[in-house]
């Protein structure tokens, strides 16, 4: 790869060229990142310590919360450190590494949301067989499959980019190593490669998003036979899941289901996908979930009791 590349590092222009405004953005990112870590870790601790949250849904939610922390950690800390150090450069290897990790966690998230939708489908449409179908072994295999699938997706993206020569310019009009930005900087024809990227990322996002929407439609239609209380509980859970699905997939589809061109709004979509959504997910899952809120209250009471001793 070194023989093909004259470029050894890239310059990231960030969200804005206004230094003072960029400092404000970084401060906001810091607050949001800390909130993301604390919120998601609180959910993980609550689920692990609560005996009432032992269903597969909460098992998957634990991994989704951990994933949100890791996904957000790919972007936010570097943006904050770059601002403090006044450094806006990233090496070619660092750029490709960041790209791989972004798509790895993103791919895992997509598959995990699909698994969670299937879990809700079985719980609502086949309640008598739920414990058999969603056994601990099956749940572990599904989570493992999500991580393997995410790794394969990211590896394909990395292999696409690994062979591209970069000979200048080396300026990326973004705050992260964006896939399409890199393709536009390549000193070779990337038309075919752009189509492959769209197929690997864009088509995958659209296909899975449509499958998820269809799944939740089937689930909602099956609620007619439920009691009013059961219907309300199922609707509350499904609406939370569906909100997270929309927040995750809409930016993904916008960013990758299109020709290899860049737009100013790409930065806002990247902020939404990597910083805002991981922060909102815990709030969405807990605000309408009585079981989680009850478990959090019990956990808080335990902490107060320990602190009082």
Curated annotation (Swiss-Prot):
Belongs to the G-protein coupled receptor 1 family. GO terms for molecular function: G protein-coupled receptor activity; olfactory receptor activity. Residues 1-23, 78-98, 157-193, 257-267 are extracellular. The keyword Transmembrane helix applies. It is found in: Cell membrane. InterPro entries: GPCR_Rhodpsn, GPCR_Rhodpsn_7TM, Olfact_rcpt, Olfactory_Receptors. Odorant receptor. Its main location: membrane. The lineage of its organism: Eukaryota, Metazoa, Chordata, Craniata, Vertebrata. SUPFAM superfamilies: Family A G protein-coupled receptor-like (SSF81321). Residues 48-55, 119-137, 218-233, 288-309 are cytoplasmic. It is a multi-pass membrane protein. The chain crosses the membrane at residues 24-47, 56-77, 99-118, 138-156, 194-217, 234-256, 268-287. Keywords: Cell membrane, Disulfide bond, G-protein coupled receptor, Glycoprotein, Membrane, Olfaction, Receptor, Sensory transduction, Transducer, Transmembrane, Transmembrane helix. This is Olfactory receptor 4C6. It comes from Homo sapiens. It comes from the Eukaryota. Glycans are attached at residue 6. One of its GO terms (cellular component) is plasma membrane.
């Amino acid at each position: 790869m070194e023989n093909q590349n004259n470029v050894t590092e890239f310059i990231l222009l960030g969200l804005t060229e206004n230094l003072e405004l960029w400092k404000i953005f970084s401060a906001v990112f810091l607050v949001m990142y800390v909130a993301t870590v604390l919120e998601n870790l609180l959910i993980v601790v609550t689920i692990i310590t609560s005996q009432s949250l032992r269903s597969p849904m909460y098992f998957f939610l634990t991994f989704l919360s951990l994933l949100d922390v890791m996904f957000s950690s790919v972007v936010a800390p570097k943006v904050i450190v770059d601002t403090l150090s006044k450094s806006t450069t990233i090496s070619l290897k660092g750029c490709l590494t960041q790209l791989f990790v972004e798509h790895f966690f993103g791919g895992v998230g997509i598959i995990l949301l699909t698994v969670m939708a299937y879990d809700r489908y079985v719980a609502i449409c086949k309640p008598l067989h739920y414990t058999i179908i969603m056994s601990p072994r099956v749940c572990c295999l599904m989570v493992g499959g999500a991580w393997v699938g995410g790794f394969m997706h990211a590896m394909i993206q990395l292999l696409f980019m690994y062979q591209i020569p970069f000979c200048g310019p080396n300026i990326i009009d973004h705050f992260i190593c964006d896939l399409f930005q890199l393709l536009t900087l390549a000193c070779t024809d990337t038309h075919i490669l752009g189509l492959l990227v769209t197929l690997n990322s864009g088509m995958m996002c659209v296909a899975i998003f449509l499958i998820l929407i269809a799944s939740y439609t089937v689930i909602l239609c099956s609620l007619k036979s439920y009691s009013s209380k059961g219907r309300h509980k199922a609707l509350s859970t499904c609406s939370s899941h569906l909100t997270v699905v929309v927040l995750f997939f809409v930016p993904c589809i916008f960013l990758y289901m299109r020709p290899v061109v860049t737009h100013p709004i790409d930065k806002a979509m990247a902020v939404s996908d990597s910083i805002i959504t991981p922060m909102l997910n815990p709030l969405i899952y807990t605000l309408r979930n009585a079981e989680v809120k009850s478990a959090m209250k019990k956990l808080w009471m335990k902490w107060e009791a320990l602190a009082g001793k």
